[in-house]
């Protein structure tokens, strides 16, 4: 069935460590798949059947990347959305309840109403450099935290710890 001629289809994807919750609006289709290569492949096949206007997924700090790469490979129009914008949208429409299904529905509703600009995938080198910078910043933060902890230790203990 070609649903695209009848209405604009928007897909909301709530990403979790172990599963993806997917809601297709306005068709009221909800399903979950494991956040694995096979699960993502199955989700992409199902989503493509409905010819969506956009697929919106919240930026979750890397958990969403395999799904984004699959969307890009499948030539699906996708948006990596700022979680704060989705949270503010939820507040604006008065949605307070929270679970995985409702989050996926909310993201699809956000996609339909706000129609955020599609995301373009950065080159592999840019993504790699960004990942390295992020990891460096994490390590620097941890190093600062350890230095601060070392300063408040009793002298007899801190003197036995090698400085870095």
What residue ranges belong to the model's regions?
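Short, glycine/acidic-enriched loop or turn micro-motifs at the edges of active sites
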Residues: 17, 61, 85
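Acidic active-site catalytic centers that drive phospho-/nucleotidyl reactions
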Residues: 14, 58, 100-103
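Long, charge-rich intrinsically disordered scaffolds of nucleic-acid metabolism proteins
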Residues: 79-164
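Gly/Thr-rich phosphate-binding beta-strand-loop-beta motif of the actin/hexokinase/Hsp70
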Residues: 2-25, 107
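Nucleic-acid-processing active sites and adjacent nucleic-acid-binding tracks
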Residues: 25-54
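Short glycine-rich phosphate-binding loop at a beta-alpha junction
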Residues: 52-63
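Anion (oxyanion) recognition and catalysis
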Residues: 72
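Short hydrophobic/aromatic-enriched beta-strand-loop microsegments
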Residues: 31-34, 75-83
